[in-house]
């Protein structure tokens, strides 16, 4: 017996500790995230990784109420031109540095001053930041900013270690250090991103999974096969065509909630030489009129999604009923093309290698062809596509926006003249004024009037083709418990468990 115990003890010592202690959750992503730096990130899949890495000042509940995360509370001034935020005590960044008011000041200023920041326009009204004491910070605004708290529930509110950010500079996204429950371990491009639970996280008892691996698999069939085989335990943004297979597997579950965002095709209006193809508004209107959105949704997505043409879903109180999804009118589209002097319009549409958008682009190509329009389809990795969009190296590209709890987050950064994500360089001064004023008005009815006016102008200008609103489906193994779906599609790891 003593000999057997000796052998078992030796084996215990030789085997790596994780084989006994760690439980590893593997999540299949639709594509590889861009830089893991909240300031310059714009890819949706990056937000899924940040949910583990980077806590925010605020978060949302499943019913979209804004609640403190790294903050403990806040108070607006009477004129809503300053906000005082109390911070959680005893929080440290993953490098051991303390989280405090000074670090909040550093992060907000970093968002505002970093070249290429996508957060700058989200918090542009923050004029100065006052460190009241170690756990109290006050933002002074140039004018009221109603959607500020909503912005701080996402990347604008994510806090990174000032020490690490200063040391790494523009390479920070390769070795991110935040204040979340999981720390960065490794990234293999197009392979996986690995994070591990932080031993001294202030609320570590709420997180049961020891290690998370995010695995980009662009082909949805392969992603589903990996879930069914057990190689993955969760997959995000399940395609509607895969739902029946998941629902028929007793070892799997799927949840679905209406998304906050929309699927879209930005059209290059004025961003560099490639804008010439679609700079004439009549050509953009023709593209819009040649689309049958209802048929598109039924054909590609089995009717699981909602046809749309606005930056908010028909289920939102801000939806403008005066601008319904237009009926297809091929004759009118041809007339507009003729008036613009391009009866045989040809342009290039860049599409990422993801099944839903690949299949939708083929249907769109056929619809446009019936109006005499040639759409040349070009496949490009999602991150590369977004980088090309930033540079103006596109005529049109197929992307999406996952949506934000406040309507401002769905439109301001894309449609204002100096918006950080206005890749098409659309600029309408009336739209600018309306969207800017909507940021300052707290009354919902008054805000809706402003958004309605902007929506009606944009519907005529067609700077981007908004096509549908998804239901966000998440597939997962029955080994996974404690998962709660959110309308933003982001997986929260608090309370989530993985059975052996």
Feature-to-residue mapping (PLM):
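N-terminal lobe/hinge region of extracytoplasmic solute-binding protein
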Residues: 28-78, 109, 174-178
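Gly/Pro-rich hinge or "lid" segments in bacterial periplasmic/extracellular proteins
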Residues: 65, 153-207, 211-213, 221, ...
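Ligand-site clamp/hinge motif
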Residues: 199-245, 281, 365-366, 374-376
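Append "and occasionally in soluble cytosolic enzymes with long acidic Gly/Pro-rich linkers
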Residues: 197, 248, 255, 278-366, ...
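Aromatic- and charge-enriched surface segment that lines or borders ligand/interaction sites
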Residues: 72-117, 132, 138-140, 226, ...
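Extracytoplasmic/peripheral linker and loop segments enriched in polar/acidic and small residues
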Residues: 285, 297, 374-385, 412-478, ...
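Surface-exposed binding/hinge segments that line
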Residues: 75, 86, 120-163, 479
């Amino acid at each position: 017996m003593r000999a057997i115990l000796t052998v078992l003890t030796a084996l215990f010592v030789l085997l790596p500790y994780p084989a006994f202690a760690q439980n590893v959750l593997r999540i299949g992503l639709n594509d590889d995230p861009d830089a893991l730096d909240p300031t310059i990130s714009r890819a949706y899949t990056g937000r899924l990784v940040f949910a583990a890495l980077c806590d925010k000042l605020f978060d949302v509940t499943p019913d979209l109420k804004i609640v403190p995360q790294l903050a403990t509370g806040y108070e607006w001034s009477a004129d809503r031109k300053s906000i005082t935020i109390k911070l959680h005590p005893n929080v440290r960044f993953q490098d051991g540095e303390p989280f405090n008011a000074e670090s909040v000041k550093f992060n907000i200023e970093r968002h505002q001053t970093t070249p290429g920041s996508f957060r700058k326009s989200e918090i542009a009204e923050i004029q100065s930041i006052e460190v009241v004491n170690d756990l109290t910070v006050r933002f002074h605004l140039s004018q009221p900013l109603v959607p500020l708290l909503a912005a701080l529930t996402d990347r604008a509110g994510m806090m990174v270690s000032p020490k690490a950010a200063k040391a790494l500079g523009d390479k920070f996204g390769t070795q991110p250090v935040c204040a979340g429950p999981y720390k960065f371990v490794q990234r293999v491009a197009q392979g996986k991103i690995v994070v591990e639970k932080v031993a001294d996280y202030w609320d570590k008892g709420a997180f049961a999974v020891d290690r998370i691996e995010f695995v980009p698999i662009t082909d949805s069939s392969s992603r589903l096969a990996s879930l069914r085989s057990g190689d993955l335990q969760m997959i995000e943004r399940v395609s509607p065509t895969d739902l029946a297979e998941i629902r028929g597997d007793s070892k799997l579950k799927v949840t679905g909630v209406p998304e906050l965002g929309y699927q879209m095709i930005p059209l290059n209006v004025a961003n560099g030489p490639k804008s010439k193809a679609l700079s004439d508004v009549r050509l953009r209107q023709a593209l819009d009129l040649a689309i049958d959105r209802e048929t598109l949704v039924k054909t590609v997505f089995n009717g699981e999604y909602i046809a749309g043409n606005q930056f908010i879903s028909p289920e939102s109180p801000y939806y403008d009923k005066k601008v319904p999804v237009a009926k297809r009118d091929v004759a009118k589209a041809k007339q507009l093309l003729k008036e613009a002097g391009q009866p045989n319009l040809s342009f290039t549409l860049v599409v990422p290698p993801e099944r839903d958008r690949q299949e939708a682009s083929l249907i769109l190509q056929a619809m446009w062809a019936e109006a005499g329009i040639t759409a040349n389809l070009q496949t490009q990795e999602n991150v590369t596509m977004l980088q090309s969009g930033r540079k103006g190296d596109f005529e049109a590209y197929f992307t999406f926006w996952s949506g934000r709890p406040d309507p401002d987050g769905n439109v301001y950064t894309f449609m204002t003249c100096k918006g950080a994500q206005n890749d098409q360089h659309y600029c309408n001064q009336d739209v600018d004024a309306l969207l800017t004023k909507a940021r300052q008005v707290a009354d919902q009815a008054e805000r809706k009037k402003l958004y309605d006016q902007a929506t009606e102008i944009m519907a005529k200008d067609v700077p981007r083709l908004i096509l549908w609103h998804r239901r966000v489906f998440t597939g997962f193994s029955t080994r996974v418990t404690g998962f709660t779906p959110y309308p933003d599609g982001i997986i929260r790891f608090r309370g989530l468990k993985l059975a052996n």
